[in-house]
Amino acid sequence: MRTIKTRHFTGTTDNTVTKRELENRKVARRAAAEGMVLLKNEGILPLKEGTKIALYGVGASRTIKGGTGSGDVNERETVSIYQGMKNAGFEITTEDWIKDFDEKYQAARYAWRDEIENEAAKLEDQVSGFFNVYSTTPFRMPAGAPVTQTDAEVAIYILSRVAGEGADRFDEAGDYYLTEEEKKQLADICSMYEHVIVAVNTGGLADLSFMDEYVNIEALLQIVQPGMEAGNAFADIISGRVTPSGKMTDSWAVKYEDYPNSKTFSHNNGNVDKEYYTEGLYVGYRYFDSFDVPVRYGFGYGLSYTTFETKVLSTVLKDNKIVVETETINTGDTYSGKEVVQLYATCPEGKLEKEYRRLVAFDKTGLLAPGQSEKMTLEIALDKLTSYSEAEAAWVLEKGSYVIWTGNSLESSSPCAVLALDADVVLTKTQNICPLKEELEEMKQSSEKITQKLAALLKFTEEKALPVMELKAADVETRVVEYHSNAECVPAEAREFVDTLSTEKLVALASGDPGKGQGSNLGSAGISVPGSAGETNDCALEDGIPGIVLSDGPAGLRLMKHYNVYEGKIVNKPFKFSLEGGLFCEGEPADPGETRYQYCTAIPVGTLLAQTWDTALIEEIGEMIGGEMEEFSTTLWLAPGMNIHRNPLCGRNFEYYSEDPLVAGKIAAAMTNGVQKVPGCGTTIKHFACNNQEDNRMGSDSIVSERTLREIYLKGFEIAITESQPMSIMTSYNLINGVHAANCEDTCTKAARCEWGFQGMIMTDWTTTEQGEDCTASGCMRAGNDLVMPGAFSDRDNLNQELVDGTLSMDDLKACISRLVNIVWQSNQFENAVPYKKVK
């Protein structure tokens, strides 16, 4: 018996800080500190308590907590670096500079707001039109006052940048490069102060050539965008209260031009309609490592205040898995710390060209005191060593020697064992998907160079007498994927129920309810959560199917900080009031009725979370988010975002985890496992797939080979699904080889459901089907994309028309609604819900 919960208004009527807020801030602070990466330290850090500090940079008092757009969070307050350093007992000698900058900042913010309001007022659509103006008009920080010399012992400079949804960054001053004002500030700081520390507070990578100019920059930290506890977490690292343990999840090139797609990415070549993935597999470290291009800071790199030594105790082949047992000891004498053990593999060259090394496993120790050690067991499943053969339509292991490396970064890793395979073997037989419709010439290595590098590597393994594990192809079982149509991938009980619903209700359920969340009467509508992204239709409420609420992420729940209830209804507020912490509603008259407060936790952005390399911590954060979802009646969190960092100028990289699919998949799985510990709550992994460009994101076509698509851009989603079974997937706006991702049966049904065993629901990104006739609601249903969001009457018209003319089958529509119903039944809108992962 399923009992729908009694409905209620979310939030509290008391504006006092709650126990939940205080406890969750602690988790956010811990995560922020653990994800910050110490890139350089010439003995200056940590600083002693009470050290006099000259603090400069726009991020000093206006620290960027996160990106803009759907990834923003309306928290109660954010702790700036200035506040955090004062809280930690440091003396700030540049109070006047900071006060002057704050005044300039406020004036610039209001001018920016007015510019957006004025431009948006000219447009007919005041919702999507406003957001388009907002997302393509980035806020530019004002310049601070001239630097002056104080009696500080150390100067700290905070380099900050804002990025967000809807627009890519530029390789120009004020974005990837320093402005002339910033160069002058940094030059003055380095001339006036003997000891200088720089922190990079940006959503993506930035040019660091200034590090080559100033020898007295003695420490460099990558703090990304650390969430609401930014300042306290920064002070924890600077003071030594927390020892840095973050590691890079990207490769920081010496110069932007070193990235293989730097000339053609997004607007760089003037073409935002088609994005040719000519670098193929060679994304991030796979390129730099394979082509021997030096980097400034490499993948997996990060310093500590202490030192570690990791020994490989054993490497064995067990049940067709490589099992590596390691022991890590803190060899320092002062600071406790954590270390990340990373395993890489070099795969043999056969018919398929391969990257020189790929990440295949990682784990992080607990906090180790000086002299303390910890043993860990890492496993490498055979699928982590496979490559995709388009010719065979299969994941294959090619004959030869697979060299396993261990280290605490890619650069520091060294060979530790070899797996010898006696013959080629197919691990998984699939069908081809997403075929190219035009020629694509991918980057290739010199075959002679490959042969030389591999020969030298194998010679080294023989000279060192590294252990060799023998694997016979005959002992490897081949899995042959069974493919089913969209209409066949259906939960039986839900399908029986759906057969009882009218066509009118089926069509209504196929898209979100456009009226929810604004002025809804709780007596006649579903639960409405102001600031949430949307709600599914509750047209079948009398049949036992309530609407469920979906809230944006991925840096926490994005809701309105407060709203009013008047005469039993939520007072309607424009969408823009949920942006920028309420900047666009300042000066508006007070609303009538009772005020309710819903403060959510702003956790660090995705990149910083991934830089922790700590799946246990990420799972803890996920469970924390799930608790807030329950408190605010949210079933689906529209997160985590897990697209690949293909180029550092992608405007949305801050939301995403890494240039590496294993990191992206593992972190997303951990976040999902945490959220879904909370009964009836689930994640929505996104954006599926190849959403690596924000300019023209609604119409950009990603031209990519099937092998690259599978090994780089789909692999993270595959890992997340097989290791955590998220409730939902969100498709992306872009096309993949000429087919809109939202209308792509190859990815939605063949890959996600048939190959990876996805059991949940798939939804579109917002307004995907409202951009033209080549992406339709009916196309979504045929592809196995179950829910069109946020919902428009034009979607219903399209579905009804195609049901009548037979273009859309009733079986396809019912299959999609069955999967939606199956998720709603397991949601927190029912009494006695259980964690989703426990539902068979």
Can you say where each PLM-predicted feature lies in the sequence?
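Glycoside hydrolase catalytic-domain context in secreted enzymes
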Residues: 1-387, 396-412, 430-840
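Extracellular/periplasmic metallocenter environments
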Residues: 393
